């Protein structure tokens, strides 16, 4: 029997202000890489919030199976990155970009400081090689290019060894060359045996070739 990493059946949020028009029934099967595609305001973010357990359900069931992970909590196994601005940064990186500017770059943290200590040395080596992080370690985060910021944040997130990685609009604000680079990086990520990738996209043209389910 195939493993269902995320299974929601007839899901309706308890909070009436954050309900979709219809109950949600959806299965994420192990080995699938999924794209959730829709226009702005279509409810993509709310769907992700339901799948990750952010909103308790009034009706329906939500079941996780994150094997071979040592824990079965959504907090440990599902990581979400929202790329919101032209720098390609999400919550944490956006904070750093706004906090430090050209007048106080000396106080801005280095990439190596923000990545911190790593418990799994094998995973660290694999990710550093995949994203070519070594040349970036001595750089200040505020000075990273949009492509470098994407790679930094993916590395920082993946060092937590999630089972499911959800990325919201990962291609927003990128030029053509950087988009192609990110396509290549994500395709390599999709080959990691224990990682399931979910992309939240606004346009069908952004769907990479490794996506197996829409």
Positions of predicted regions on the chain:
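Helix N-cap at the start of a conserved alpha-helix in ABC-type nucleotide-binding domains
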Residues: 176-178
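Conserved ABC ATPase signature
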Residues: 140-144
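Hydrophobic anchor residue at the start of the ABC signature
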Residues: 154
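H-loop/switch region of ABC-family ATPase nucleotide-binding domains
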Residues: 200-203
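A short, flexible loop at the N-terminus of ABC-type nucleotide-binding domains that lies
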Residues: 1-32, 41, 55-58
